[in-house]
Every structure is written in structure tokens, then in C-alpha cells.
Swiss-Prot record:
InterPro entries: Oligosacch_biosynth_Alg14. Residues 1-2 are lumenal. The lineage of its organism: Eukaryota, Fungi, Dikarya, Ascomycota, Saccharomycotina. This is UDP-N-acetylglucosamine transferase subunit ALG14. Heterodimer with ALG13 to form a functional enzyme. GO terms for molecular function: N-acetylglucosaminyldiphosphodolichol N-acetylglucosaminyltransferase activity; protein-membrane adaptor activity.
Amino acid sequence: MAWLAIVCLLAATTALCVRMAALAPGVYGPAVCGGRSGGGRGPPRHVMIFLGSGGHTGEMLRLLEVYGAALVAGATVRVGYTDEASAERGRQSAALRAARGVEYVPLLKAREVGAGAGAAVRSTVRAAAQAFSAVRRARRALHTGPHVVVLNGPGTSVVVLFWLRVLDLLSLRRTRVVYVESLARTESLSLSGRLAYPFADEFVVQWPDLAQRYRRARWFGALV
């Protein structure tokens, strides 16, 4: 019976590898912020964004000011946030007010600035557990799941991306993820950017040197 167990293990491993390959970035072509998941014109029907506090929130909101008509106008939007100040800034955003519907989803910070290693590990575990529940509910509430998820900034965005990919793997339905690196990163990627780089469908940088250094990065000029 040992041979049967080996065959079953090989079959399961092959199936898992095929599924992971099918969901790998680039298999379905580049994500287009203004497109629908099935082609056609107009904004995607379901969008999820993340407001990561402070300057990260400011950059995301400026991005929406410029590209909101293509991205969120008329769409259903889920807004993840880690502090109430970011949520309030989102509520004041003209771009988000143009959405068909907006729901704000509180998320825990993966790491507080200045936290020690032990505290950072504990906060990351708590944030990961809470983010899984939030991401799963977002996919369920949006029926077919977010067609585009736009992320930037701190570690919580990486946690969100991780759970999206886990759920993609389980459901064999890929969520398009666009990660926008901060304007402040001129010569190297942030830690969050380095972690997100292999898993984002579109990895956008705002300086040409970064686009030359990282093969999958795309540069469209300064977006914010």
C-alpha cells in the first residue's frame, strides 16, 4: 500500500502546483485599474482599498483624486483602515463619495512604530487573525469578490495581500491586486514592498530607477 500512498501524495502535490501556477502573477496578463475582470470598459464593479495611516493614507487618497473616475466612480468600495483619522479622511474624499457604495472595515496595525521585536510579533499575529476575518467577509459581501484591490504602505497591507492569496488558492479565483510603492522610495523598495512584490499583479513604482532595478515593477511617473 506504500506505493498507493506515494501516488496519492504525488497527485496531490501536482494538483497544488498546478493551482498555484494558475494563480501566479502574470498568468492572466497585467491588471488594469480601469477595466472589468471580464473585459469591457468602465470601472470595476467591486474595489477594495487600504488606508494605512499618516502619509500612506495621504498618498492613497491623492491617488484616488487623480484616478478615482476610472477606479471607484460607480463601484462598490470596501475601505480598510487602521486608524479613525484615516477613515475620516476617506469619508471626506470626493472620489469615494462618487462610489456607488462605501463600507469602512477597521483593521489592526501589524506593527506600531518603535515597537520591540516581541511586541511586533504579537501585534502581527493579532492583525493577521483579524485581517483574515475581514478579508473573507469582504469577498463574501462583494459576491464575486473584489475585482481590484489597491494597496500601499505599511505591514497590514502585506497581511491583507497574504490572505487574499490564500483565499484565491482555496477558491481558484484570482483577485487582482495593485500595489503602489510610496513616492518616498527612490532607490530601494520598502520592507512591505519587498514582501508584496512577488504576489501583486501590478507592482507600481514612482521613480524610473526602481523600474529598471525590479523587473516586474511598472513606472507611470509620479502618481501622487
